[in-house]
Amino acid sequence: MAMKKLLIASLLFSSATVYGAEGFVVKDIHFEGLQRVAVGAALLSMPVRTGDTINDEDISNTIRALFATGNFEDVRVLRDGDTLLVQVKERPTIASITFSGNKSVKDDMLKQNLEASGVRVGESLDRTTIADIEKGLEDFYYSVGKYSASVKAVVTPLPRNRVDLKLVFQEGVSAEIQQINIVGNHAFTTDELISHFQLRDEVPWWNVVGDRKYQKQKLAGDLETLRSYYLDRGYARFNIDSTQVSLTPDKKGIYVTVNITEGDQYKLSGVEVSGNLAGHSAEIEQLTKIEPGELYNGTKVTKMEDDIKKLLGRYGYAYPRVQSMPEINDADKTVKLRVNVDVGNRFYVRKIRFEGNDTSKDAVLRREMRQMEGAWLGSDLVDQGKERLNRLGFFETVDTDTQRVPGSPDQVDVVYKVKERNTGSFNFGIGYGTESGVSFQAGVQQDNWLGTGYAVGINGTKNDYQTYAELSVTNPYFTVDGVSLGGRLFYNDFQADDADLSDYTNKSYGTDVTLGFPINEYNSLRAGLGYVHNSLSNMQPQVAMWRYLYSMGEHPSTSDQDNSFKTDDFTFNYGWTYNKLDRGYFPTDGSRVNLTGKVTIPGSDNEYYKVTLDTATYVPIDDDHKWVVLGRTRWGYGDGLGGKEMPFYENFYAGGSSTVRGFQSNTIGPKAVYFPHQASNYDPDYDYECATQDGAKDLCKSDDAVGGNAMAVASLEFITPTPFISDKYANSVRTSFFWDMGTVWDTNWDSSQYSGYPDYSDPSNIRMSAGIALQWMSPLGPLVFSYAQPFKKYDGDKAEQFQFNIGKTW
């Protein structure tokens, strides 16, 4: 188009001017048609100046130079005596850009592409560029199977040489694959091969991966899958000869034909390693061992190359070259693999830098590093630093970038790029059940106080049955070696009766201090001391509660409604944590095991021990870690020492959002069995089911939960991509389907003594539920929604199908 205008302008010039081949001297230069472009700017873009002697070539260069500015649609150069007359028609200025009909491509993406091509409001309109954009967008639609799509640019003139630019889209419908044919396959059926494709000619309703809508990019991926399928099974000569994609006349159907040559199966005869190995030949040979007669496998060859690169990367060879060349022997159907290795230069780390940590101090991140400045670059150490930063839970994403130092042949800078998340949370929990009604709690937690890495929490609960307050502080790096120090103060006024638990009141307060000791990269130990004062009152005559009081030398009375008891206990607290999760929140890979326990020490009124074991394992089932299987367990056991029982208020409970969803919090397990109350002020509202013997009340059964000294909970969860959520928020929102089970029992319950009542010592009374959960890392903290349906429950259990929590509970 531009060359055509240039030719026309040249012809006009030739017809409008007459001068000799020797040229003429320009005395003056005049412009006609300039509006937006200043005369000075136009003169600066021209190679001709007043006083110059010009000829035909100079005129042609002038026209080219003016067109090259992008400001003009037409240029004419005329001679008027000794004056050079330049007549121009300016390109119109874009006043606005709008889009219509685009559903597959968002406005923001279109604007970015237009700006990258120089098309933006305030710039001049280049019709050639617009035509290229039209074609490029149509090509994009064709690549995703929308062959009837069209994109037209509508230019509406406005006053003062301005225009409105509107891109009108008619996207049409995606062409569906009618049939996929593979020609030349003998070892495997066509159905078997196509079953590994994303594109399908038939998609069952349950297949969430397959797609009948044609996309050029997906077809390329499927062809690579086909190639890998054969190469991984020994077909070293496999080749895709050609691919034909045919479109039906109505442009709504696609036929795909893939012509292949399978060849024969080949076995590996050996691996030969050569090149510059930098003294690591023995380690490299360990990575290249093969089983005799093993089939050639392309994926294993690629993995072997990657393993060699990772090995060399640990020793500072950041950019090794590893090339495998299969030497095929068609006579005996074998492949000898020749691996050439060049380690390249050994690189050293000049600096470690952090980007994106606007809140967290550099020191908080730097102390997690295992790679040292000045040492050679170890890829495994860099990765460990990334893992440790992820496990902090302070960041949504952590990426690493190894940058060569300009002018240095053997130095790099390691850059950790982090995206911080809100580490503070306002905790608010709410639940609703047909029997429980509404329950809620609140608190504030900051895991990265002022960017120092300190965890500070101020938590509190105030409702019908509890007043709770807690202040906790943890310094994860009390010493430079990573020894942590944490402390806690708490007060709790708990009315168990109003919480649908066994009837008693406990006012307690206490403190504890804990030291944490790192053992290695993934293991740590904890040890500390604690003190707690418990003031029990209003204890109703409940069998398990009375059993504990008798073991403590007390003699409670069923005729006294205000039984009270006080204890002061000192405990030795201990723990062990194994943490190999890939990140601190929303993990997708790895395991975590946490063992906690406590035992009373001399000077305590009580004598008991208590142990809890929590495990969680995440197993990704795809390369992108979008589909993940999660298995969780929680085990708990406690008992008395020296003939005493573990206090009933230390019992384990199950049910609720953190254990078995679909059941009301803490209601799974043994229920209270009461002795007949003989006090004159006995509360008639208590709904006990009392057995009688010889006309007198014997024992009374209730639905009040009392917990037990043993607990087992397990959960199997399938984490899936969240529908309608873009990849931008994939790290903030998580959807899962779950199956929960659990039970609580009392090992000290004597079923022979209480015949006719449920055997609360039986651990096989397992409750089960299934449902769906949604988690969101919101600005307020983690939001958890779950809906579960109990499908195995027992008399007295209380269902709570929908549960909603903001933050964690304590």
Swiss-Prot record:
Stored Pfam families: Omp85 (PF01103), POTRA (PF07244)
Protein's cellular compartments: Cell outer membrane
Domain POTRA: 24-91, 92-172, 175-263, 266-344, 347-421
Endpoints of the signal sequence: 1-20
Presence of keyword Signal: yes
GO cellular component: Bam protein complex
Protein name: Outer membrane protein assembly factor BamA
Encoding gene (name): bamA
